[in-house]
Regions:
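Eukaryote-specific, cytoplasm-facing alpha-helical/coiled-coil scaffolding segments in long proteins
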Residues: 214-216, 338, 418-428
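Short loop/turn motifs that connect adjacent beta-strands in outer-membrane beta-barrel proteins
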Residues: 178-183, 270-271, 286, 319, ...
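Flexible loop and strand-edge segments within Gram-negative outer membrane beta-barrel domains
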Residues: 196-198, 242-279, 283-287, 299-374, ...
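Outer-membrane beta-barrel pore domains and translocons
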Residues: 188-192, 279-281, 327-329, 400, ...
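Short, small/polar-rich motifs associated with maturation and membrane association
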Residues: 1-308, 322
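Extracytoplasmic gating/loop element in the C-terminal half of outer-membrane beta-barrel translocons
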Residues: 221-224, 237, 357-361, 378
C-alpha cells in the first residue's frame, strides 16, 4: 500500500487476503461475491514476553537470547506519574534501582538513583547514562513523552562493552523517531495538586511560655515569664511585646499546582521520517507572598521548563541511514532572595513569641527578640527574589551502514555530538 494505506490487488473469489504489519495483529479477509472495496483496521498486538525486544549495548536483541541482567522498563507506566521530573518516577517502578529525593523545592526536586547500590565500584557510584547512544550527565530535564524505550544494564556481561564507566550500571534510553505514513499529531495536558506530606505543628504563644517555664523549673532555673506576662500573652492585649504568631500558617500554603503539556508529531515517507515535540512543565511554590508589593515582585518559589526535540531519519541508500537530532530545554527557577533553605531554617527556629510580623506602627522587625535569627516573614518576602535561567542544547549526528556484504548482521555506526550549556543568575531587590 502507499503511505495513506490505499492498495490495489487482483484476486479471485473465495481467496483470502492477509494483511500483516510488524507490531499489529494479522487480519485475514475471505473475498466473496463482487466485492471491490475492502477496508480493514489493524489493532496493535501485545508483544509476547518471549519475542520482546530489549535494547542492549550492542543494539536490539530478543529477550529470549539475552543472558545478562537487563531490565526493560515499561515507559507507559512511568508516564502515569504526575511529576515534573522524570527521575522521580523511577522510584518503586524499576527493579534494582535505589532512588533518593533530597529536596522538595521546585526545580530541585530531582532524585538521585543507583543501579548497583550506593557503595559501589570506583570513586563515583552513579550509573552511566546513554540517550540515543550519547553519554549524558543526567536525565533530570528529559521529557518523558519523548522516550521510546528505557533499559537498565546491571551485571558485568551486559555492561562490559562500556568498560570501567559501566561498572555501576548503564541506563540506555532511546527517544522516539518518525514512522512512514501520514502525519500523526498527539497532544496531552495534565494538572495536579501537590500538598505537604509532613509539617511540624507548633504550639501557640501561651502554651510555649507555660512549657518553657516548666522546663526551666525542672532544671532549678527561674521561670522565663512571670504570671502577669502570662496573662498578657493569653489575652493578646500587647501584640508588639507578646505576639502570638502562627508562622507556618502565615508563610506556607496548603498546596500548589503543577502543570504538564506536550504536543508531538511524526510522519514521513520511505526515504525520510521525522519526529518533533514541544513540552511545557510548571511547578508552583508553596510560599505566601506580600500582597502589598508590586505584582511582578514574586518571591514565591516556582519552576518552569520548556523542552523541544527534533529527530530526522534519512535513508541515503537502502543500506545507509543518516540520523539527525537536536534537543534541549530552557528552564527558569524562582526563589526567595536568601534562598529556600534559609526560609525553612528561620521558620523552624522561630516560636510564636519570638517576634510580631509587624509592629502596630507598621514597621517590620528584621530580627526576633533575644535571637539572631531573621524574622521568617522578612526572609521569605522582603529580601528580594532570585531568577536562575538555564539553557541546554544537544545536537547529534549518527550514521549507520549495513555491511552484510562482508559479514551478515555486521553494522558500522558513527556518532558525532555537540552540546552547549549556559546559565544566568539574577537577583532582584
Amino acid at each position: 500500500s502507499n503511505i495513506n494505506g490505499k492498495y490495489s490487488i487482483k484476486i479471485q473469489q473465495y481467496q483470502t487476503l492477509v494483511f500483516s504489519y510488524i507490531g499489529f495483529k494479522t487480519v485475514s479477509i475471505l473475498v466473496k461475491g463482487d466485492t471491490k472495496v475492502i477496508n480493514i483496521k489493524m489493532q496493535e498486538e501485545k508483544i509476547n514476553a518471549v519475542d520482546e525486544v530489549v535494547v542492549t549495548g550492542l543494539g536490539k536483541q530478543k529477550k529470549l537470547t539475552i543472558t545478562g541482567a537487563i531490565t526493560n522498563v515499561d515507559v507507559d507506566k512511568l508516564r502515569k506519574y504526575p511529576t515534573s521530573n522524570f527521575t522521580n518516577a523511577l522510584a518503586g517502578n524499576v527493579p534494582g534501582i535505589i532512588t533518593m529525593q533530597s529536596s522538595g523545592q521546585p526545580g530541585k526536586n530531582t532524585s538521585r538513583f543507583w543501579v548497583r547500590g550506593i557503595s559501589t565500584f570506583g570513586a563515583s557510584s552513579d550509573a552511566m547514562i546513554l540517550v540515543d547512544g550519547f553519554e549524558r550527565p543526567n536525565i533530570d530535564d528529559l521529557n518523558i513523552e519523548d522516550i521510546e524505550s528505557f533499559s537498565v544494564l546491571k551485571d558485568a556481561s551486559a555492561t562490559a562493552i562500556y568498560g570501567s564507566k559501566g561498572a555501576n550500571g548503564v541506563i540506555l534510553i532511546t527517544t522516539k523517531h518518525g514512522k512512514a505514513g501520514k502525519i500523526n499529531i498527539t497532544a496531552k495536558g495534565e494538572t495536579s495538586y501537590n500538598t505537604r506530606t509532613i509539617t511540624p505543628k507548633f504550639v501557640d504563644a501561651y502554651n510555649y511560655a507555660t512549657l518553657l517555664n516548666e522546663a526551666r523549673i525542672t532544671r532549678n532555673l527561674a521561670p522565663q515569664y512571670q504570671p502577669e506576662e502570662l496573662a498578657l500573652i493569653k489575652s493578646g492585649l500587647d501584640p508588639d511585646f507578646y505576639p502570638n504568631v502562627d508562622w507556618t500558617n502565615l508563610l506556607l500554603k496548603d498546596g500548589a499546582m503543577s502543570y504538564r503539556a506536550d504536543i508531538n508529531l511524526n510522519g514521513g515517507g520511505n526515504t525520510a521520517r521525522y519526529f518533533a515535540s514541544l513540552a511545557y512543565v510548571e511547578d508552583q511554590g508553596m510560599y505566601n507572598t506580600d500582597e502589598t508589593l508590586r505584582k511582578k515582585y514574586n518571591t514565591n518559589a516556582n519552576y518552569k521548563r520548556w523542552n523541544y526535540r527534533m529527530n530526522l531519519d534519512i535513508d541515503i541508500t537502502p543500506t545507509t541511514i543518516l540520523k539527525l537530532g537536536i534537543s534541549g530545554n530552557l528552564n527558569k527557577r524562582n526563589s526567595p532572595g536568601l534562598g529556600d533553605q534559609y526560609v525553612w531554617g528561620e521558620l523552624f527556629g522561630f516560636n510564636a513569641l519570638s517576634s510580631p510580623v509587624r509592629y502596630s506602627n507598621g514597621y517590620i522587625p528584621a530580627y526576633g527578640r533575644n535571637t539572631y535569627q531573621m524574622n521568617p516573614w522578612v526572609s521569605a518576602t522582603q529580601t528580594g527574589y532570585n531568577q536562575e535561567w538555564n539553557n541546554n542544547i544537544q545536537t547529534n549526528i549518527t550514521i549507520e551502514q549495513q555491511l552484510d556484504f562482508l559479514i551478515k548482521g555486521l553494522t558500522f555506526t558513527g556518532r558525532f555530538g555537540y552540546d552547549t550549556y549556559n546559565s544566568n543568575y539574577i537577583h532582584h531587590r
